[in-house]
Amino acid sequence: WNKGYKNLIPVNQYNVDYSILGGSRIEPLLRDIRLGMSAAGMTVESVKGECNFGQHEIAFKYSDALSNCDNHVIYKNGAKEIASQQGYALTFMAKPNEKEGNSSHIHLSFRGLKGELVMTDEADKEHGMSEIGRQFIAGQIAHLRELSLLFAPNINSYKRYVPGSFAPTAIRWGRDNRTCALRLVGHGAGLRLENRVPGGDVNPYLAVAGIIAAGLDGVKKKLKLEPAFTGNAYESDSSRVPASMSEALELWENSAWIKETFGAQVQAHYANMARVEIAAYGKAVTDWELFRNFERF
């Protein structure tokens, strides 16, 4: 805060994606975060370095949707507190600099009322996926653009969507295809859908609510799923993730499905939230403007 978040020194000065040494250098902090989350009842599956300098990823064992959202909030606050105690500043903002952004990929599968597998079907030799699973994904594709405000709730969120940056720009689904917004991974009981659109700044409750609502609409309407995309989705002519909060606001505010699904009050509330954010950003004088214009004019 006192430095205005400028000239901060990252804990790693290079790309430490899957680097054992890179993780070891910050292990005292990572260990305390793992132990703290375990003490809070979470099961930490892995921690690893990532591409941006000082960027690290943590993964937790799956649970029911509401419990995972609760754990998400506890983790983010707890990790910040633990980092502060060790003299570090930690951020989950979607795009803290021009390198790779911070994501919050949501992995989701679902069961029947008696706990039975309903997303999988071993008779499907292509993907091992049931017709209900296909309809659920089709619902995601149908409604992803109008739900973007729930996945990307800040001005900064949209700066993460850059081609080739591990953040999606194309609304397609693919089998283990990281260039798509939706990625199908696993098999059998572990078959699941990854939504790669949410960033680290996401409100998990809103994002998960949107994912479930879109999927159920796909099942209700028996939507047909397009074939899996197999190429580089960044280079495709696919429908795109909104490039700005203004675009996402327009899609959200004008959606009859959003109004029907969440209610007019919820639709109006989050539309107002976006307008407030956009207005505040419009009044700010940024470093980019100073650098570009101070000597120029």
Residue ranges and their predicted role:
Residues 1-297:
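Glycine-rich, acidic/polar active-site loops that bind/position phosphate-bearing ligands
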